[in-house]
């Protein structure tokens, strides 16, 4: 995630991440803090690691079926709007890239999604799985955001 804020003193960002981390909830931490050089409108996509955990082991053929699901031309899920209503949203055009691998108990998805106008929360991949491949619904999902990218796939800074 990207947190855009202003400070009341001159700073290059050093030391701010450590100070912010002292007040963050468990599981959330600030990785870096730096001066904004570019406008937010140049932010294009988000890269995340999505881990699907299966207590009884990954179902046979799950990685291939999930790879096919994420490559579909249309992938409609129900998503809450800002008004808290449910709306059908096609997330397929918002998925830029998805690499799927697996071991015995986990499926790993290295995914790049559209970040804004509209943006896709990578956590919603779980909803797509539940809607289209309910037999592959994992016991637990972990999402770790890795990078925020510009239109050229470079780190947004």
Give, region by region, the residue ranges found by the protein language model.
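Residues in flexible loops and secondary-structure boundaries
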Residues: 13, 36-38, 58, 106-108, ...
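Short amphipathic alpha-helices in soluble, non-transmembrane regions
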Residues: 13-24, 61-71, 124-129
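Generic structural motif
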Residues: 8-12, 23, 53-57, 103, ...
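Core RNA-modification/binding signature centered on pseudouridine synthases
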Residues: 72-157
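Ordered, amphipathic secondary-structure segments that act as subunit-interaction surfaces
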Residues: 1-51
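Short capping loops/turns at secondary-structure boundaries
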Residues: 41-43, 59, 118
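Residue-level recognition of well-ordered beta-strand positions that form the cores
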Residues: 4-6, 49-53, 99, 110-114
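A contiguous pocket-lining binding segment that forms or flanks enzyme active sites
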Residues: 49-87
């Amino acid at each position: 995630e990207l947190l855009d804020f202003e400070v009341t003193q001159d700073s290059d960002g050093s030391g701010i991440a450590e100070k912010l981390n002292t007040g963050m909830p468990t599981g959330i931490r600030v990785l870096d803090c730096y001066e904004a050089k570019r406008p937010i409108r140049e932010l294009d996509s988000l890269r995340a690691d999505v881990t699907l955990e299966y207590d009884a082991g990954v179902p046979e053929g799950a990685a291939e079926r999930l790879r096919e699901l994420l490559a579909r031309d249309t992938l409609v899920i129900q998503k809450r709007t800002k008004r808290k209503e449910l709306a059908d949203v096609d997330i397929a055009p918002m998925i830029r890239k998805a690499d799927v691998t697996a071991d015995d108990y986990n499926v790993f998805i290295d995914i790049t999604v559209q970040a804004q106008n509209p943006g896709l929360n990578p956590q919603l991949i779980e909803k797509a799985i539940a809607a289209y491949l309910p037999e592959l619904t994992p016991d637990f999902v972990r999402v770790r955001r890795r990078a925020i990218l510009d239109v050229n796939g470079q780190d947004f800074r």
